[in-house]
Amino acid sequence: MVVLVDTVSANPVRPRHPEKAARPDALSPKKPDWIRVRAPTTRGYGETRGIVKENGLHTVCEEAGCPNIGECWDKKHATFMIMGDTCTRACAFCNVKTGMPGALDANEPAYVAEATRKLGLQHLVITSVDRDDLADGGAAHFAATIRAVREACPTTTIEILTPDFLRKDGALEVVVAAKPDVFNHNLETVPSRYLSVRPGARYFHSIRLLQRVKELDPSIFTKSGIMVGLGEERHEVLQVMDDLRSAEVDFLTIGQYLQPTRKHHAVMRYVTPDEFAGYQTTAYAKGFLMVSASPMTRSSHHAGDDFAKLKAARAARAR
């Protein structure tokens, strides 16, 4: 049997994606010239990695194999992934380890706050694995982490990228009550691709989640993103834009899907930079306050700079 070994853990024999091991290889086309990243070798990268490891934390930058890790960590920007490194879902696009997670670490909020202080982060992004095994999906842990960072770093703005809290009544309200500055929940793809790409989620549940955030606290910026290159059609991407605007989402990100391993969903095509520029123009015309659309766009990439632009755009629209 083919086993996908863990390339993040120090244990090289632990299967990272056991549910994908028996799948046939899915071959993607060769990457075009515009998909290029620099190897992470700088001093800043090493310092960031040291602080992350010193505090026993996980980052989505490493676990998901983000192509922008070298650039972000060189600037001491890291996205902390809370509630462990093991996800209860098995999405076809994602490189995060899957399986049954362990118990939550009650000290993790304090560790995140301390790492935020050491890195000197002015804008922090916190994400998590899905924790369908928990009664509240991890909502209380999210809220505790936000509060810990607020106490340790009162001037740091906080952006969260959450799971969908599917069938977790009251969970969203707990997270929103902690008052993050930005609430991000990614749709990931168009509705027609959910069964093959994101089978554990429900598209319109995610739309409703984002809409509910605005109902609970209109001052919180909302954000969502999708990947392209998974077999979607252009008109479907435009429909996603309309659905997000109907939920009053402020910020849209669109990036190129890149295949983590041959056992993951294949890249169906590489969307050109001109097509991304067209999506960005259209999204602004539909009313988003902020749009980032490019081959290398990821949810947390340039998040701090984008937050400043987001605030400025809201202020300008209010005048």
Swiss-Prot record:
- Any idea which UniProt keywords this protein has? 4Fe-4S, Cytoplasm, Iron, Iron-sulfur, Metal-binding, S-adenosyl-L-methionine, Transferase
Q: Which reaction does it catalyse?
A: [[Fe-S] cluster scaffold protein carrying a second [4Fe-4S](2+) cluster] + N(6)-octanoyl-L-lysyl-[protein] + 2 oxidized [2Fe-2S]-[ferredoxin] + 2 S-adenosyl-L-methionine + 4 H(+) = [[Fe-S] cluster scaffold protein] + N(6)-[(R)-dihydrolipoyl]-L-lysyl-[protein] + 4 Fe(3+) + 2 hydrogen sulfide + 2 5'-deoxyadenosine + 2 L-methionine + 2 reduced [2Fe-2S]-[ferredoxin]
Compartment(s) of residence: Cytoplasm
Q: Which residues form the Radical SAM core domain?
A: 73-289
Cofactor binding comment, as recorded: Binds 2 [4Fe-4S] clusters per subunit. One cluster is coordinated with 3 cysteines and an exchangeable S-adenosyl-L-methionine.
| Pfam families the record matches | Radical_SAM
Positions bound to [4Fe-4S] cluster 2: 87, 91, 94
Q: Which PROSITE patterns match?
A: RADICAL_SAM
Could you say which cofactors this protein requires? [4Fe-4S] cluster
Region described as Disordered: spans on this chain? 6-29
Using the UniProt record, name the top-level EC class of this enzyme in a single word.
Answer: transferase
**Pathway this chain belongs to:** Protein modification; protein lipoylation via endogenous pathway; protein N(6)-(lipoyl)lysine from octanoyl-[acyl-carrier-protein]: step 2/2
Against SUPFAM superfamilies, the record matches this protein to: Radical SAM enzymes (SSF102114)
Q: List the biased-composition ranges (Basic and acidic residues).
A: 16-29
Q: Which GO terms describe its cellular component?
A: cytoplasm
Q: Which InterPro entries match?
A: Aldolase_TIM, Elp3/MiaA/NifB-like_rSAM, Lipoyl_synth, rSAM
An annotated Gene Ontology molecular function = metal ion binding
Residues recorded as binding [4Fe-4S] cluster 1, renumbered to this chain, are 61, 66, 72, 300
Give EC number(s), comma-separated.
Answer: 2.8.1.8
Q: State the family named in the UniProt similarity comment for this chain.
A: Belongs to the radical SAM superfamily. Lipoyl synthase family.
What is the protein name for this chain? Lipoyl synthase
Species this protein is from: Rhodopseudomonas palustris (strain TIE-1)
Q: Which gene encodes it?
A: lipA
